[in-house]
Amino acid sequence: MKQFPEGFLWGGAVAANQYEGGWKEGGKGITVSDCARSHLDVDVQDYKKQNEVTTADIEEALNTQDEVYYPKRHGADGYHHYKEDIKLFAEMGFKVFRLSIAWARIFPNGDDAVPNEEGLKFYDDVFDECLKYGIEPLVTISHYEPPINLVLNYDGWYSREVIDMFVRYCEVIVDRYKDKVKYWLTFNEVDSMIRHPYTTGALIKDRFPGKNFNEVIFQAMHHQFVASALATKIVHEARPDAKVGCMLTKLTYYPYTCKPEDVLQAQQDMRSTYCYSDTQVFGEYPAYLLSKFKNEGINIKMEPDDLKIMKEYPVDFVSFSYYSSSCVAKDDNCLKKTAANTNVAIKNPYIPSSDWGWQIDPIGLRISLVDLYDRYRKPLFVVENGLGAKDELVNGTVDDQYRIDYFDAHFKEMYNAIVEDGVDLMGYTSWGCIDIVSESTKQMSKRYGFIYVDCDDLGNGTYKRYKKKSFDYYKHVIETNGACLFED
């Protein structure tokens, strides 16, 4: 009988900044995401404009209590609904639930002398609720949630001081939750700092006048690499059987034509995304990244033990997000473009697109799994994947057959990668297993979940939960460990 390996971890994923809400409750401080404004008047495919942030924007955000144009302040109101939501996840049969800890719930300003006990107790309750149903928490330590104080008073991860603050934060949460959490991720989509430095690195370009901003970004990235290695050390010392992973954005690139120039461009673009996971897996900077630093005059300041720390504490597994593939060409000026995950790419004429222009490519997931496993020879974990769509609630449910078709095709390609290609895949968590505020466009109407949340792009609604048609589909996939995918 065809089915996934025994012990395969099926589940779903959210991030605190998109799910929780409760932005000023329980002693929580303000985060970079609480100050990220939605731009409903900007083209949803214009990722750069959607995510540009200035110091003036932050000052404006801090002077308002508005939750309409700052939708991550309310999210899906998981802060008040998590027990109800976890019960629904258990009904689907989740083996694992990926979530993040909001740094500012534990240290409201990042540099506080003592942690916030109310925040620590909140996550105790969340993890206990998961474990009550036999659901393993998979915890992201930092998922676009640095306290805003780190931006305004330290210039974010550019400052070496932030490593020490992050390490103290890790020491507190790992000591507190080591008996409840076995699986950890250090930084979400660690490679994304080059594309959105504000949410990932707490960096704002106008705060570095006269500086090479790419150098600023890579300096901040170096600090995150050191911090990630130290976090891995902390977890392993606290719980030797725990597993720590890195997490990258899997941007799978195809050459638009077989012209050697296009093939080379695709290879170079792939390397530009792999350099971050290469560093965390192998514990050292790859030669091609060092060449980039030299050729572009980027000077990274390091402490004497930095490279030693990175080498001694690499990650145990590689996790990633996969939503779509992209086409690239050496000269793309005359080619039609479309949106993708945190970038814009050439439109592939052979595959369909979602409501938001992201191209749907299940085979690309298999290609990604094979590429990553051949490169790293470490267990893999798909921790984000799914279809953002415009769902319509009718008679208390959503007939989202389009989402079922999406998952069905992707799950079959995951199976092929495991059985035919020999990939060691630990598990799968669908992104936004319950509807949450979109990271890229700050919209609630871009829905990914098996569970519909009654809330619109302006925060209006009851926040009541409704099961979609895909809820029962995923429940059946999990209870049969994928065998139902191959039934006639």
Task: Label each PLM-derived region with a short phrase.
Residues M1-D66, E91, N109-D111, L120-D488:
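Active-site region of glycoside hydrolase catalytic domains
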Residues K95-A102, E136-T140:
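Short, well-structured secondary-structure segments
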